[in-house]
């Protein structure tokens, strides 16, 4: 797997558990972005693959992104959470890069083919997760679970 062009994939404190991987790959995932001016956007995503759980690397196929893509290109900071917050109550924060060709686009094509064979991605968003937060209600709500230095 090639390295990000701008983001370092080196040693990572943020590791995704098997349960987190299953949740991200099988649930609807919401991605939050913001424009360079701070205007927020949230969009539901389904075509997702965890590329490396040990390094917190996640790929999302770009099938219908408009505001989300514009925001990522202006401001690569993103946050993710799954629709199933009851069982997998986590928020993932990280940095995204966009690819319109190459290895990541090929992976996005495979992800789409498994979901819906007639989908053809425009590109791939690859996210390096740098922080994970607990979203479970109670005294630990909002608590930082893991963070890369």
Curated annotation (Swiss-Prot):
Question: Where on the tree of life does the source sit, at the highest rank?
Answer: Archaea
Coiled-coil stretches, from where to where?
A: none
Query: Which Pfam families does the annotation name?
Result: PNPOx_N
* PANTHER family listed in its UniProt record: 5'-PHOSPHATE OXIDASE PUTATIVE DOMAIN-CONTAINING PROTEIN-RELATED
The protein's name is Uncharacterized protein MJ0282
Q: What is the lineage of its organism?
A: Archaea, Methanobacteriati, Methanobacteriota, Methanomada group, Methanococci
């Amino acid at each position: 797997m090639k390295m990000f062009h701008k983001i370092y994939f080196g040693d990572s404190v943020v590791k995704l558990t098997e349960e987190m991987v299953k949740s991200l790959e099988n649930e609807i995932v919401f991605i939050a972005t913001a424009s360079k001016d701070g205007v927020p956007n949230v969009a539901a995503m389904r075509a997702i693959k965890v590329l490396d759980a040990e390094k917190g690397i996640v790929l999302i196929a770009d099938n219908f992104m408009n505001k989300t893509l514009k925001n990522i290109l202006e401001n690569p900071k993103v946050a993710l959470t799954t629709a199933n917050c009851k069982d997998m109550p986590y928020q993932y924060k990280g940095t995204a890069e966009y690819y319109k060709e190459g290895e990541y686009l090929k992976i996005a094509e495979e992800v789409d083919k498994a979901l819906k064979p007639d989908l053809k991605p425009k590109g791939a968003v690859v996210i390096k997760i740098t922080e994970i937060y607990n979203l479970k209600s109670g005294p630990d709500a909002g608590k930082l679970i893991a963070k890369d230095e």
